[in-house]
UniProtKB/Swiss-Prot annotation:
It catalyses: molybdate(out) + ATP + H2O = molybdate(in) + ADP + phosphate + H(+). It comes from the Bacteria. Residues 5-238 form the ABC transporter domain. This is Molybdenum import ATP-binding protein ModC. The gene is modC. SMART domains: AAA. It comes from Rhodopseudomonas palustris (strain BisB18).
């Protein structure tokens, strides 16, 4: 395997009973990488392979150039510096929350320069009030927060999360997601996050590995895979693209943020934020309409110059349009769904410049994408 620093390189190939796995990908060793696909496509199996719990001959894995396995070596699970969070918290019922958190933590971790400390984990995950309680008396969301804290205190080089919210109801998921976002904002620890819920992926992930039937369809930045018409995400009824945006201004009179994206500016209803802060936006294909000329007297606030990159038919009546923001067509990608009649009526074609009217912009709650640090400890330490 080629030694590439600051990247995760994986290639797992082999038969597991009747299931054939052929998964190869390279992603940055920073941020959150979502491993996404339908149930049974091999996502959890890939995590087990990364952890060394499943051994397939001839497979390879390396992170930051540190080879964990290849044709000549295989590091056992206990020798791999990973934290693993499962669907179920699996806490020790006879131990307190504090004892569960400290279980397995290296004794010399407090003296390591880049380690995350006990107090930092307590603060990040909001666990101070739970330390003396028994796991038996915790809610599902509290148990998962403790499990995440225990994984972090093992001082991992890589955090694996296998559908950590799948056993929780929607209300509890909404309670725990902000804590995961805080971890993303404050820690530089790479995470591989398995889910079949695209809403979780869109809210958390920076990069995406898209799987189907044991194979990797594509791997890359989240927005790039969302806007690729050759992949199933763009053709789905709820297709959308996520953007990283920078706050430029806030209008308290109307409660609107002005944010800059690659290729333009958007007005977003949102609470106040500081200039320079980063926010994640989501624009659904169904919330984008097209015009050949700048409209007048419209209620739509976000009207941006764009250029058609490509188009693909969706059945007999609709067309998926891939747009690039900005007059030069080199900005962020955006999706739109239009009827074939509208396409013909406007005489649209690839390469044409037009106006994209964005009727709705969703702001990820509490998400400040920040800047990624290089240390596994707290950002900016």
């Amino acid at each position: 395997m080629r030694d590439v620093s600051r990247s995760i390189q994986a290639q797992f190939r082999g038969a597991l009973g009747r299931f054939a796995l052929d998964a190869a990908f390279t992603v940055p060793a920073t941020g959150i990488t979502g491993l996404f696909g339908p149930s049974g496509c091999g996502k959890s199996t890939v995590l087990r392979c990364i952890a060394g719990l499943q051994q397939l001959p001839g497979s390879t894995f390396a992170i930051d150039g540190d080879v964990w396995q290849d044709a000549s070596q295989f590091r056992q699970p206990h020798q791999r510096p990973i934290g693993y969070v499962f669907q179920e918290a699996s806490l020790f019922a006879h131990l307190s929350v504090k004892a569960n958190l400290l279980y397995g933590a290296p004794r010399d971790a407090a003296h390591a320069r880049d380690s995350i400390t006990f107090d930092e984990v307590i603060e990040l995950l909001g666990l101070a009030a739970l330390l003396e309680r028994s796991p038996r008396h915790l809610s599902g969301g509290e148990r998962q927060r403790v499990a995440i804290g225990r994984a972090l205190l093992s001082q991992p080089k890589l955090l694996l999360m296998d559908e950590p919210l799948s056993a929780l109801d929607r209300l509890t998921k909404d309670e725990i997601l902000p804590f995961l976002e805080r971890l993303h904002e404050r820690l530089a620890l790479p995470v591989i996050y398995v889910s079949h819920d695209m809403a979780e992926i869109e809210r958390l992930a920076d990069h995406l590995v898209l799987m189907r039937k044991g194979q990797v369809l594509a791997a890359g930045p989240l927005a790039a895979l969302q806007s690729d018409p050759a992949l199933p995400l763009a053709a789905s009824r709820d297709a959308a693209v996520n953007f990283e945006a920078t706050v430029e201004d806030y209008d308290p009179g109307y409660g609107l943020l002005t944010v800059a994206v690659d290729g333009g500016r958007l007005l977003v209803p949102a609470p106040p934020a500081q200039r320079g802060e980063h926010r994640r936006l989501r624009i659904a294909a169904g919330d984008v309409s097209l015009a050949r000329e700048l409209p007048h007297n419209t209620s739509i606030l976000n009207v941006l110059p764009a250029r058609i990159v490509s188009h693909n038919p969706l059945g007999d009546s609709e067309i998926l349009v891939v747009l690039a923001l900005g007059g030069n067509g080199e900005g962020a990608r955006l999706l739109a769904r239009v009827t074939r009649r509208s396409w013909d009526h406007l005489e649209l074609a690839d390469g044409i410049g037009l106006i994209a009217q964005v009727k709705g912009v969703a702001l990820a709650p509490g998400r400040n994408t920040g800047t990624h640090a290089s240390s596994p400890g707290l950002r900016g330490r």
